[in-house]
């Protein structure tokens, strides 16, 4: 089996490649230079030449606020490039794993979103990822759509690194407490994605670590595990206005993982502890 991983220098792609190599599965990771999501011909030629059995599509435009001003670029990368990648997967009979997001939902209420609940993205980024999902479903039969949220890992920027860096120069921080969701540890997710790649249990899944929290709760746990004494004050989202609307409710049900026989990811607190080891 051969697996192609897009965006392998990013947070998730980095750990997916590492997990595949640990399992002795032949794989290749793509960079922007050799596999440009804005150059359809180059992208298709790369896939046809490598002939993967599975494409794990981690590469994405993720600058949520910037996307409000770069609508076309965001759509090109998250939607149109995904559509073209799905087409070449269809031609080469490759499975495709598309990484999506909680942002496809409205992000209101307090219930856990099921995979087939109504989609109502509230910003440009969320709409582009939903359009990518729809393209994959329209073109392919052999696909996995995996929705995640609040991603963290050892490679790249994330909330944990931001908090720890801020703590170096501040003795007091304010963190939003009215956005609720679940962190996703890239190492745990990479294991699940590799399990999916080896299966034919196609469909849409939610795959965050177990448990829910607010960003404030997350920050408090980060400092607790790092043994950093700092005053963290909870504040509403209105204290930090952003160009793009953020979901207040990112709770996502993982029933589909259970139904398919996939293991759920460990508790987010345990994942954080694992990262700190």
Predicted regions and their residues:
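N-terminal Rossmann NAD(P)H-binding glycine-rich loop of SDR-like oxidoreductase domains
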Residues: 3-20
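Active-site "gating" loop of Rossmann-like NAD(P)-dependent oxidoreductase/epimerase domains
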Residues: 61-64, 69, 101-123
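Conserved C-terminal active-site "lid" loop/helix of NAD(P)H-dependent oxidoreductases
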Residues: 214-216, 220, 236-275
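NAD(P)-cofactor binding segment of oxidoreductase domains
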Residues: 69-97
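Adenosine-cofactor binding site in Rossmann-like domains, unifying the SAM/SAH pocket
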Residues: 21-45
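NAD(P)H-binding glycine-rich loop region in Rossmannoid oxidoreductase-like domains
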Residues: 40-77
């Amino acid at each position: 089996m051969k697996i192609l991983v897009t965006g392998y220098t990013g947070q998730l792609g980095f750990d997916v490649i590492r997990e595949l190599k640990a399992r002795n599965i032949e794989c290749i990771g793509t960079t922007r230079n050799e596999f440009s999501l804005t150059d359809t011909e180059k992208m298709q030629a790369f896939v046809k030449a490598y002939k993967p059995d599975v494409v794990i599509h981690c590469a994405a435009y993720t600058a949520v606020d910037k996307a409000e001003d770069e609508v076309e670029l965001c759509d090109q990368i998250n939607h149109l490039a995904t559509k073209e990648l799905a087409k070449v997967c269809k031609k080469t009979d490759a499975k495709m794993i598309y990484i999506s997001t909680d942002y496809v939902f409205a992000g209101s209420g307090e219930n856990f979103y099921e995979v087939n609940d109504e989609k109502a993205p509230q910003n440009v980024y969320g709409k582009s990822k939903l359009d990518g999902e729809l393209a994959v479903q329209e073109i392919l039969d052999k696909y996995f759509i995996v929705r995640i949220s609040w991603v963290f890992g050892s490679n790249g920027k994330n909330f944990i690194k931001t908090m720890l860096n801020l703590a170096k120069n501040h003795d007091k921080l304010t963190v939003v407490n009215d956005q609720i969701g679940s962190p996703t540890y890239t190492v745990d997710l990479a294991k699940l994605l590799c399990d999916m790649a080896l299966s034919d249990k196609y469909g849409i899944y939610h795959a965050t670590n177990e448990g829910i929290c607010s960003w404030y709760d997350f920050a408090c746990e980060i400092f607790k595990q790092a043994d950093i004494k700092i005053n963290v004050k909870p504040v509403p989202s209105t204290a930090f206005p952003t160009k793009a609307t953020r979901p207040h409710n990112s709770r996502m049900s993982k029933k589909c993982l259970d139904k398919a026989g996939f293991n759920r990811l460990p508790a987010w607190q345990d994942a954080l502890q694992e990262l700190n080891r």
